[in-house]
């Protein structure tokens, strides 16, 4: 079994578990499951890691995109530059952090922006806002 999941708090707004459960089923991935790990404090991520031996990946949502970084063994360059992580890959117990928000926001912005757009107003200061700021550079 390969376990994937989402960490954050609260997770009542999230559609991730339903989406990925349906996606795994439609792709014939019976050995894959997706769980929500609603943790009130970031320190509880250690419990998630220790109690989920089949865990291979996590999505990270509010309020932990910034707070999760000290729990990573490796962070990619974008995580280092933005100070935000939204995706963790676990290989042989090593937790590697990535920021895929930058790619998503960047792709969306590239469709709309032209060379005449020289300024932007980014509302917010959290992990997603940091990804947007990075994508706008």
Region annotations inferred by a language model:
Residues 2-113:
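Phosphate/diphosphate ligand-binding glycine-rich loop within oxidoreductases
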Residues 5, 121-123:
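Conserved beta-strand elements of the Class I
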Residues 133, 137:
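Gly/Ala-rich phosphate-binding loop of Rossmann-like dinucleotide-binding domains
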Residues 116-118:
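Intrinsically disordered, low-complexity terminal segments enriched in Ser/Thr
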Residues 129-130:
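N-terminal Rossmann-fold NAD(P) dinucleotide-binding loop
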Residues 9, 124-126:
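Glycine-rich Rossmann-fold phosphate-binding loop(s) that bind the pyrophosphate
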